[in-house]
Amino acid sequence: MAITHLYGLIGFPLGHSFSKKYFTEKFGNLGLSQTHAYEQFPIPTIEEFKGIIAANPNLRGLNVTIPYKQAVMPLLDEIDLAAAQIGAVNTIKIAEDGYTRGYNTDYWGFRTTVEFWDKFKNFESLKACVLGQGGAAKAIIVALQDLGFEVIKVSRQASEETVSYEELPDLMEEIGLIVNTTPLGMFPKVDDKPPIPYELLNKQHYLYDIVYNPLETAFLSTGLENKVGGIYSGLEMLHGQADKAWEIWQKKLS
C-alpha cells in the first residue's frame, strides 16, 4: 500500500531529533503504518524548503526545528495568528495543492507542562528568566506572560530588551524560574551548560530545560547540587507540542 500521508522534520542538523521515532510509533498505534510515514529532511539552507514540498506531493505536514523556526516564515503561504504574534513557526500544515500554513505548538507544549508541574504552586516568585533568544524562546516568553510571569530575557549581549549573563547575579534574588532554551548541554556536548551564577541558586529557584537528550542536563544536575526547588526536563514539552501538531495536521485547511 502506498504512503499517502507523509510528514517530516526540517532543520539542521537533525541527529538530536526524537520526532521520527515518536510519530512512527504513533502511526503504528493508530493502525496507520501502511499509509502514513515520517521522514527527516536535514537541509543546510532554508532555500531548500520549497524543493522538499515540490519533490514530495504526498507531504501533508512538517515540524520545524533549529535553526529555521523564524527563517521559514516568509516562505509560507499563510501564518496562524498566534504564530505570527509569537514570531516563530514550528509546525506546518500542507494541503494537497501544496498550500502551506504555519503554526506554533511550542507554546502549548511549554505552557501545559508548567501549568501541570506539581511544583508550580510552590513558586515564591512569578519572575522568570529565559536563556536564549531563538524561535523556541519566543513561544516560551509568550506562554510565561500568559501565565502571569514577568519575563527577563537573557542573551550573550545586553540590549534594550535583554540583559547579559554578566548582569544575572544582581537579579537572582528576584527570579523564581529559569528556562534554558539554548542547545547548551545537548548530546554529544553533555558537559556544556549556560553561564548562569549557579552558586547563587537556592530553593526559591526552579529550573526548566527544553533540551531532552540527556533527560538530566548539566544545567539541571548543577541546579540539584545547589538545592533548587525543582527541575523539569524538556521531554514532556516535546510530547505536548508533537501531539498538538498531530491535531493540527488532522484538520482540513479552511
Report each predicted region and the residues it spans.
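Phosphate/diphosphate ligand-binding glycine-rich loop within oxidoreductases
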Residues: A2-W117, T222
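Glycine-rich Rossmann-fold phosphate-binding loop(s) that bind the pyrophosphate
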Residues: F12, G132-G134
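Active-site capping/gating segments
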Residues: T112, F116, V228-L253
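Short helix-loop-beta connector
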Residues: F120-K127, L201-K203
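N-terminal Rossmann-fold NAD(P) dinucleotide-binding loop
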Residues: A137-K138, E216
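NAD(P)-binding Rossmann-fold cofactor-contacting core
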Residues: D146-S164
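Rossmann-like adenosine-cofactor binding region
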Residues: E161-Y232, E236
